């Protein structure tokens, strides 16, 4: 297996409020290899989105592939990763750096903004952490 795909989604009830994350780690053919579903404590939606991406990529690293594609419905995280958006909130900068360090372990990486409907599995996993 040379490519692994991570669908990641963060949720926040209240913004700020209790955060949850979900990630689905899949083969290029769409076979789910593993999942992440967890509560993160109090924070914002953007913190949750970064938390989901970081947790998903950490899990994906276990599979030892050469390439990763991160798919998220958070336009902010995607555009900050690609350098299209600057970071205005100081609390997001270390998370961006951590995420870049993690995906930098791959020979090739990409990040894609997907519609919410395409990220449904990760959303389900985030809601599962809330007990829904």
PLM region spans:
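RNase H catalytic domain
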Residues: 11-15, 54-126, 130-132
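RNase H-like nuclease fold core
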Residues: 1-47, 55-62, 66
């Amino acid at each position: 297996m040379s490519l692994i795909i991570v669908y990641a989604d963060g949720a926040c009830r209240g913004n700020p409020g209790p955060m949850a994350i979900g990630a689905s780690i899949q083969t290029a053919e769409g076979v789910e290899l593993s999942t992440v579903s967890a509560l993160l404590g109090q924070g914002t939606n953007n913190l949750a989105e970064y938390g989901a991406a970081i947790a998903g990529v950490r899990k994906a690293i276990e599979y030892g592939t050469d390439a990763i594609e991160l798919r998220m419905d958070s336009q902010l995280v995607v555009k900050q990763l690609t350098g299209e958006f600057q970071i205005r909130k100081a609390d997001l900068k270390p998370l961006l750096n951590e995420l870049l360090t993690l995906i930098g372990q791959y020979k090739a990486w990409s990040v894609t903004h997907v519609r919410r409907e395409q990220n449904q599995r990760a959303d389900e996993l985030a809601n599962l952490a809330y007990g829904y």
